[in-house]
């Protein structure tokens, strides 16, 4: 008798787990086809409203615009160009135009062990205006060291 009850309980658990996983898959497909809204009856306070669920797909790009505005408030966001691998032209111009800002950044780079080679890679195309001058000023700021070479315009090797 106990054996039959145990087998029956195990069978019910397996059936319930299977149906739950199938319903989860069905629910995932259903939410992908809808406009990603939460049904009004599912709200805890029973106020009828349309609430949008979070998804990884941005439908109206409003959330991305908010994120971009937030990034502008954070320090150092305009340092990197659109390619994400080099300094922006505005940052290079600001570094060359503002002596106090340049010294502050150079000190910060020195604390983070940024050498001339790493800076040269961040400067990207050395033929662009001001990039060679900025690299030369940074290497002069560091002072004479073994292996530190001042740059002459040309491609990165």
Curated annotation (Swiss-Prot):
Chaperone among keywords: no
Pfam families the UniProt entry points to: RXLR (PF16810)
Motif (RxLR-dEER): 51-65
Predominant localisation class: secreted
Record's signal peptide: 1-23
Cellular component GO terms held in the UniProt record: extracellular region; host cell cytoplasm; host cell nucleus
Keywords: Host cytoplasm, Host nucleus, Secreted, Signal, Virulence
Statement: the UniProt record of this protein carries the keyword Secreted: yes
Induction behaviour: Expression is induced during host plant infection.
Compartment annotation: Secreted; Host cytoplasm; Host nucleus
Sequence similarity: Belongs to the RxLR effector family.
Domain notes: The RxLR-dEER motif acts to carry the protein into the host cell cytoplasm through binding to cell surface phosphatidylinositol-3-phosphate.
Protein task: Effector that might be involved in host plant infection.
Name listed for the protein in its UniProt record: RxLR effector protein PITG_04049
Organism of origin: Phytophthora infestans (strain T30-4)
């Amino acid at each position: 008798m106990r054996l039959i009850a145990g087998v029956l309980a195990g069978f019910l658990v397996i059936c319930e787990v299977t149906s739950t996983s199938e319903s989860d898959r069905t629910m995932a497909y259903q939410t992908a086809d809808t406009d990603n809204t939460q049904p009004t009856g599912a709200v805890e306070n029973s106020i009828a409203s349309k609430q949008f669920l979070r998804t990884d797909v941005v439908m109206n790009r409003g959330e991305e615009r908010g994120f971009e505005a937030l990034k502008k408030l954070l320090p150092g966001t305009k340092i990197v160009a659109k390619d994400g691998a080099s300094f922006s032209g505005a940052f290079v111009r600001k570094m060359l135009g503002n002596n106090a800002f340049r010294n502050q950044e150079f000190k910060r780079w020195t604390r983070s062990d940024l050498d001339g080679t790493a800076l040269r890679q961040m400067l990207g195309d050395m033929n662009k205006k001001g990039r060679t001058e900025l690299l030369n000023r940074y290497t002069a700021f560091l002072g004479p060291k073994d292996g530190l070479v001042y740059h002459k315009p040309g491609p990165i090797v």
